[in-house]
Regions:
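Polar, enzyme-active/binding microenvironments
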Residues: 1-248
């Protein structure tokens, strides 16, 4: 087992090492990517805001199940039909990874929450990539993305492509910020609602709605993030994906 140093000689961050050990990762490039991600999140003062982070690295059910922020919390369990590989996890439209967590258990609040997903592609319309149906998910229609974050009023975002890093954040009762890749963030009116306390959060499938059959390479939940935070999150995650050779 790889302990203490990465291939470049830089010390491994203790939080990164905890994940590496729990995930059973031994590949030097993957270790480097995880270590740099943790260090970048700390440099950008984002680490303390993160609650659940699934980097989907290592290509196994074990490595893909672990939460980078706390490896003992939110460990994913899988239905049949989930594929694991170098690009992350892939469902079949009805399969899913179950966080075991309700929105009320993640650590977000009604007016302080953020979430994001990194997609290699998003091919099928009228599907949801993660979360749960109703008020915490991203929905792909035609030809738009509809982000829902503690609200049942989904704004409409029209991306140039349906791939890469998509993030949404709420810092108040009125507005939602949406950011796609390195494009400028957009603020929408989307009044907040109380957290859902009955549906668990899934990946590859939004609990109670059609799932995706595309590769998912990252998923996170955090406290509310500012526009600057979303920019920095995109920088850190895109660097992580680039190190792994799966950037979009």
């Amino acid at each position: 087992m790889f302990i203490g140093r990465k291939s470049s000689g830089a010390a491994i961050d203790p939080n990164a090492q905890s994940f590496i050990t729990a995930a059973g990762i031994s590949n030097a490039i993957e270790i480097q990517a995880i270590n740099e991600l943790v260090l970048d999140l700390k440099t950008f003062s984002l680490w303390s805001k993160m609650l659940v982070v699934y980097p989907f690295v290592g290509g196994t059910a074990q490595s893909n199940s672990k939460n980078l922020k706390d490896t003992s919390f939110g460990t994913l369990s899988y239905s049949t039909g989930i594929t694991h590989g170098s690009l992350g996890i892939k469902g079949n439209g009805s399969s899913y990874a179950n966080t075991g967590l309700l929105s009320t258990q993640v650590g977000i609040s009604q007016n302080s929450a953020a979430s994001g997903v990194y997609m290699q592609s998003w091919a099928v319309n009228q599907t949801m990539a993660y979360g749960h149906f109703g008020n915490l998910t991203m929905y792909k229609g035609l030809p738009a993305i509809y982000p829902l974050l503690n609200s049942n009023l989904a704004p409409t975002y029209n991306p140039a492509t349906f791939d890469g890093f998509m993030q949404m954040s709420r810092n108040n009762a009125t507005n939602l910020i949406f950011k796609h890749k390195n494009n400028l963030a957009t603020t929408f009116v989307s009044p907040s609602l109380s957290l859902n306390n009955s549906l668990r959060l899934y990946v590859c499938f939004a609990n109670n709605y059609n799932g995706v059959s595309d590769w998912i390479s990252f998923n996170y939940y955090s406290l509310g993030l500012t526009e600057t935070d979303l920019v920095n999150m995109e920088i850190a995650v895109q660097k992580f994906q680039t190190t792994l050779g799966r950037q979009k």
